[in-house]
């Protein structure tokens, strides 16, 4: 009753009961299946574990991105954004020099913040001027007057040199209203402490400036001229300044008049989007009825920050990064008589923080998104008025429309370090800025 069996250890053949053999073979098959099933389950576990980790990572990234606001669409979707070298230039611009940097002759080092106004047939240009360092107590608000559209300029004159101990008055903005010329200038004590805005009105008979005192406090420094809103008040863009810090957040701000009373302005500081750091929020605006767009300077990245108000500047969305690159410098903005919105600064693809070339971004008529950029001037400017160099800064623009032209004042450091600037002027025919749909 015995059958041969295999002795696997010694290679010998013996006998084994057939039922026992069947039992062993069956159990051996079960073990193999169990091992295969275990391996399969282990593989599935490892795969599931890897997929779970990957999914968790994706969800974490999506969650973090969800916390970041989408770029504000101030640049029109689908419009081509070119590099600086490929941007078209405006060919028929007239250039003039308002004040040449000439320390050897006049002792002035710092110059910045051109302001412009046309008043009773004359062109006024103001700026902050200092024989010492920038943002020190020796700074003065000065101006010059041209009677031929900016080709030649009269003597340097003073709006306010600061008549209190430790008081400095610097650059500001003009405002023409009901036949009178007003000026609003940033001022401070010491080195950028207690920053505020002071108002002045030109006395036509004496050619001196009447002082109307402090009209806005809590750091407000105006950067561009007031614009009338739909509610009858005027809105003036600027920022809330203080002693500079590379890590500080100095937000964009606006001041709102009490009707035509320019002796009192309500300050509104614009909130800042979460995560924004190193902001020096010098700002500009354009006004579309009750809707106001504020475009301001960033510090961490070369991108325009944009905020929006739907109630004539009383409440704002936070200043947040837009989809338009812009150098880290003060912009100028507004609406042309054509209905086009404009932004003067340096806006070009991949240009970083370079303050050249000086550009103007334009929208199509009655649109609130820019879609075209022109170069006003580049660094090399040989044979034409103004300083020329391979590398220089063309910054801090101020713009106003008058008699078919857009007048743009700006600083030019001529390749010198810091704001050792000349004040220059570009006069652009409005017909050169028309963007066809």
Map each language-model feature to its residues.
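Short linear motifs in low-complexity or flexible loops
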Residues: 2-4, 15
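Sec/Tat signal peptide C-region and signal peptidase I cleavage site
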Residues: 62-65
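Beta-rich carbohydrate-recognition and catalytic domains
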Residues: 67-109, 117-167, 176-328, 335-390, ...
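Eukaryotic scaffold repeat domains enriched in small/polar residues
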Residues: 285, 399-400
């Amino acid at each position: 009753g015995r059958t041969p069996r295999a002795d696997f250890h010694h290679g010998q053949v013996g006998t084994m009961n057939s039922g026992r053999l069947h039992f062993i073979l069956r159990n051996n098959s079960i073990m193999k299946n169990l091992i295969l099933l275990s391996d399969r389950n282990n593989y599935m576990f490892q795969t599931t574990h890897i997929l779970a980790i990957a999914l968790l990572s994706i969800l974490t990234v999506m969650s973090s991105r969800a916390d970041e606001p989408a770029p504000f669409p101030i640049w029109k979707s689908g419009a081509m954004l070119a590099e600086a070298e490929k941007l078209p230039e405006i060919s028929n611009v007239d250039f003039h020099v308002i004040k040449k940097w000439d320390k050897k002759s006049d002792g002035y080092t710092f110059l910045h913040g051109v302001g412009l106004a046309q008043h009773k047939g004359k062109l006024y240009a103001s700026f902050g001027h200092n024989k010492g360092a920038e943002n020190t107590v020796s700074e003065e608000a000065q101006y010059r007057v041209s009677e031929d559209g900016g080709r030649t300029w009269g003597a340097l004159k003073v709006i306010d040199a600061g008549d209190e101990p430790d008081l400095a008055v610097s650059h500001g903005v003009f405002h023409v209203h009901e036949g009178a010329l007003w000026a609003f200038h940033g001022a401070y004590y010491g080195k950028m402490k207690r920053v505020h805005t002071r108002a002045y009105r030109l006395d036509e008979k004496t050619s001196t400036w009447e002082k109307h005192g402090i009209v806005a406090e809590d750091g407000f420094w105006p950067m561009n001229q007031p614009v009338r809103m739909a509610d009858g008040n005027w809105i003036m863009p600027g920022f809330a300044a203080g002693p500079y810090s590379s890590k500080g957040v100095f937000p964009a701000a606006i001041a709102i008049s009490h009707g035509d009373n320019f002796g009192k302005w309500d300050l509104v500081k614009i909130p800042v989007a979460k995560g924004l750091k190193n902001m020096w929020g010098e700002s500009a605006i354009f006004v579309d009825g009750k809707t106001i767009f504020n475009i301001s300077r960033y510090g961490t990245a070369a991108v325009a920050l944009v905020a929006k108000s739907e109630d004539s500047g009383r409440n704002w969305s936070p200043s947040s990064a837009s989809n338009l690159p812009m150098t880290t410098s003060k912009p100028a903005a507004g609406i042309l008589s054509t209905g086009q919105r404009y932004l003067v600064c340096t806006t070009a693809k991949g240009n970083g923080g370079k303050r050249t070339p000086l550009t103007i971004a334009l929208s199509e008529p009655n649109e609130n998104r820019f879609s075209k950029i022109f170069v006003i001037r580049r660094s090399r400017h040989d044979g034409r008025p103004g300083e020329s160099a391979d590398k220089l800064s063309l910054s801090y623009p101020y713009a106003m429309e008058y008699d078919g032209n857009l007048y743009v004042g700006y600083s030019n450091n001529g390749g010198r370090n810091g704001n050792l600037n000349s004040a220059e002027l570009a006069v652009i025919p409005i017909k050169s800025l028309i963007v066809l749909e």
